[in-house]
């Protein structure tokens, strides 16, 4: 078998609908567009959400809420992630988290949460640590340094 001999599996493809090829084809003359009108013209049709002049649903609904421009967005990691990627006695900071592939970019900081178990003594230097995560890190013999 050669590359030019490859064909799709039998029945997996469908022939395209050929429009405007005579009345006998079933899709000749008006090509499935009916007679005249906006939708029969080239580039015809209405934009999404247009309801014929009636006030659209998107404008009938009230506005709600706002975007807090001071909101901080943290990269969230769990204790189990640290267990998997770090050796005993390691220092966990931005650079080391980046090196082991746990973070790609730092948004407003890093927060450690307490899901999973930790058996290694790690020194954790991040922006935020949950109470359960801090307890697990200290119980394993590590230190928490919140920056």
UniProtKB/Swiss-Prot annotation:
Entry-linked InterPro entries: Ribosomal_uL15 (IPR030878), Ribosomal_uL15/eL18 (IPR021131), Ribosomal_uL15/eL18_sf (IPR036227), Ribosomal_uL15_bac-type (IPR005749), Ribosomal_uL15_CS (IPR001196)
Swiss-Prot/TrEMBL keywords: Ribonucleoprotein, Ribosomal protein, RNA-binding, rRNA-binding
SUPFAM superfamilies listed in its UniProt record: Ribosomal proteins L15p and L18e
A single MF term (Gene Ontology): rRNA binding
Sequence segments annotated as region (Disordered): 1-62
Ranges annotated as biased composition (Gly residues): 21-31, 42-52
A cellular component term, taken from the record's GO annotations: cytosolic large ribosomal subunit
Pfam families attached to this UniProt entry: Ribosomal_L27A
Keyword RNA-binding set for record: yes
A biological process term (GO) from this entry: translation
Keyword Transit peptide on entry: no
Superkingdom of source: Bacteria
Function recorded in the entry: Binds to the 23S rRNA.
Family that this chain belongs to: Belongs to the universal ribosomal protein uL15 family.
Subunit structure, as described in the record: Part of the 50S ribosomal subunit.
Name of the featured protein: Large ribosomal subunit protein uL15
């Amino acid at each position: 078998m050669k590359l030019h001999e490859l064909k799709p599996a039998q029945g997996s493809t469908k022939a395209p609908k050929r429009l405007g090829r005579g009345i006998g084809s079933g899709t000749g003359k008006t090509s499935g567009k009916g007679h005249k009108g906006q939708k029969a013209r080239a580039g015809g049709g209405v934009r999404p959400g247009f309801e014929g002049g009636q006030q659209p649903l998107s404008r009938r609904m009230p506005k709600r809420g706002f975007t807090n421009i001071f909101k901080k967005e943290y990269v969230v990691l769990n204790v189990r992630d640290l267990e998997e990627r770090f050796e005993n006695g390691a220092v966990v900071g931005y650079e080391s988290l980046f090196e082991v592939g746990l973070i790609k970019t730092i948004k407003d900081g890093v927060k450690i949460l307490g899901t999973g178990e930790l058996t290694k003594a790690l020194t954790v230097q991040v922006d935020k640590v949950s109470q359960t995560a801090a307890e697990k890190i200290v119980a394993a013999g590590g230190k928490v340094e919140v920056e």
